[in-house]
């Protein structure tokens, strides 16, 4: 069994970024394990014309170490694309390119091992280490001993109860849209449910596939959401400061119960639609409605889906909806459904065996994750369990944001080193999130803070 300083479980952008930063520190042995055979990032939503919703500097390393060999700019240099990107004049890079960049980076990191699914993690009391057991696609098993682990398993597509029915007609989560788009184009009536960016991108793609001739023959798209409208995501410069280390630190000072209440009211900071996507959809509808024509897309807000059933043997659905304000009900028929209903954390089963005995839990049964991204130990042990992309009620709306990944990883690496190698305490925002009387510079993390982690 091989011993490591850190074992990363899951290789998404955040753990990949951690592996990238650790590649600069040869004294810290590490291994990262991923079930998939290779890195892929939201492959079902890498549609033509789609971009990241954050600037390219939200890559794996730049916000912690701009000179790192695995930065996006160095990726461009290696692939002879610097001048092309220079003339591209757009901070928002294509999703296809971001995925290719991450795959390129993963291929430079020998610590990343794909095709190994972590099936169990147990705590070894004698050494205060974690025994990580993985299984390959062929069934072979491997064990690793690590003093610390970093959980980066990410989220899984969420389908509400009404969508969990068996049917022959297409009923899919938006994460499947890319690979099933052709199938949808053959259906006469398609309904998209949800009003976030993923829903809007699915609607735009379907609308681009829908010709005026198809509309004249009866084809149509319905876009339904329970939200009050199809609203844009907050993207003002001061609004973006909620995605900084400053706000993350401030948010973590708030009482846990209050945090959950606050996050519930901050949806449009990260759940809305980009202005450009809204504009493209509206402009297409405007153009296609010239002369009183039907543009082929109907939008319905404040309509909550309550029931879904197959419409006999016709290969279609009946959707039961309720209008939130009118409290009136209606039934609509459709031949296919795209449920853009978001994602939920899918914590691995083995984590349950560590809760209580090794890791503290809160009154809701969740891990207690500190401002340093460590899950609090219940047994007094010194080995750390770092949590990547914890729920937003731990660290605020920026927890899943790519732009904060490098900062979080810098904090983690500093703890593994036992010193502040990466500067993580500098103020990053103009606004102050606390009281005026507390407008002081961020306190420095002392050497003692790092010493206990080394």
Swiss-Prot record:
Enzyme class, UniProt record, top EC level: oxidoreductase
Family from the record: Belongs to the lysine N(6)-hydroxylase/L-ornithine N(5)-oxygenase family.
EC number: 1.-.-.-
Protein known as: Rhizobactin siderophore biosynthesis protein RhbE
Gene3D superfamilies: FAD/NAD(P)-binding domain (3.50.50.60)
One Gene Ontology biological process: rhizobactin 1021 biosynthetic process
NCBIfam families the UniProt entry points to: histamin_N_OH
GO molecular function: oxidoreductase activity
UniProt source species: Rhizobium meliloti (strain 1021) (Ensifer meliloti)
Keyword Thylakoid: no
Entry-linked PANTHER family: L-ORNITHINE N(5)-MONOOXYGENASE, MONOOXYGENASE
UniProt pathway: Siderophore biosynthesis; rhizobactin biosynthesis
InterPro entries tied to this protein: FAD/NAD-bd_sf, Histamin_N_OH, Lys/Orn_oxygenase
Keyword annotations from UniProtKB, A to Z: FAD, Flavoprotein, NADP, Oxidoreductase, Plasmid
Gene name for this UniProt entry: rhbE
């Amino acid at each position: 069994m091989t011993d490591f300083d850190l074992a990363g479980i899951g290789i998404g952008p955040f753990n990949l970024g951690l592996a990238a930063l650790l590649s600069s520190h040869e004294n810290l042995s590490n291994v990262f394990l991923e079930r998939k055979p290779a890195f892929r990032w939201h492959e079902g939503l890498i549609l033509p014309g789609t971009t990241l919703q954050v600037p390219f500097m939200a890559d794996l390393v730049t916000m912690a170490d701009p000179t790192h060999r695995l930065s996006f700019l160095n990726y461009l240099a290696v692939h002879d694309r610097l001048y092309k990107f220079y003339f591209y004049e757009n901070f928002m890079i294509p999703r296809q390119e971001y995925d290719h960049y991450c795959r390129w980076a993963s291929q430079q990191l020998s610590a990343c091992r794909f095709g190994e699914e972590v099936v169990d993690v147990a705590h070894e009391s004698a050494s205060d280490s974690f025994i990580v057991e993985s299984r390959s696609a062929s069934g072979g098993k491997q064990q690793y001993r690590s003093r610390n682990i970093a959980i980066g398993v990410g989220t899984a597509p969420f389908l509400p109860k009404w969508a969990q029915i068996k049917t022959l007609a297409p009923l899919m989560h938006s994460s499947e849209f890319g690979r099933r788009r052709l199938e949808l184009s053959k259906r006469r009536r398609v309904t998209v449910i949800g009003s976030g960016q993923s829903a809007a991108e699915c609607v735009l793609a379907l609308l681009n596939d829908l010709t005026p001739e198809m509309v004249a023959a009866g084809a149509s798209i319905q876009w339904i959401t329970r939200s009050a409208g199809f609203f844009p995501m907050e993207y003002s410069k001061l609004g973006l400061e909620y995605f900084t280390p400053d706000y993350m630190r401030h948010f973590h000072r708030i009482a846990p119960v209050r945090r959950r209440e606050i996050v519930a009211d901050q949806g449009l900071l990260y759940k809305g639609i980009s202005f450009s996507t809204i504009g493209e959809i509206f402009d297409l509808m405007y153009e296609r409605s010239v002369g009183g024509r039907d543009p082929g897309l109907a939008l319905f807000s404040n309509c909550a889906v309550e029931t879904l059933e197959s419409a006999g043997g016709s290969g279609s659905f009946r959707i039961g909806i309720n209008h939130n304000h009118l409290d009136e009900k209606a039934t609509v028929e459709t031949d296919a459904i795209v449920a853009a209903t978001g994602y939920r954390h899918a914590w691995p089963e083995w984590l349950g065996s560590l809760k209580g005995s090794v890791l503290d839990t809160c009154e809701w049964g969740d891990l207690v994750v500190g401002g340093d991204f460590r899950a609090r130990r219940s047994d007094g042990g010194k080995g750390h369990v770092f949590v990547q992309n914890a729920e937003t009620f731990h660290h605020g709306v920026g927890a899943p944001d790519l732009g904060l990944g490098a900062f979080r990883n810098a904090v983690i690496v500093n703890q593994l080193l036992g010193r502040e190698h990466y500067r993580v305490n500098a103020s990053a925002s103009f606004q102050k999130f606390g009281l005026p009387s507390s407008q002081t510079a961020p306190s420095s993390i002392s050497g003692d803070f790092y010493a206990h982690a080394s």
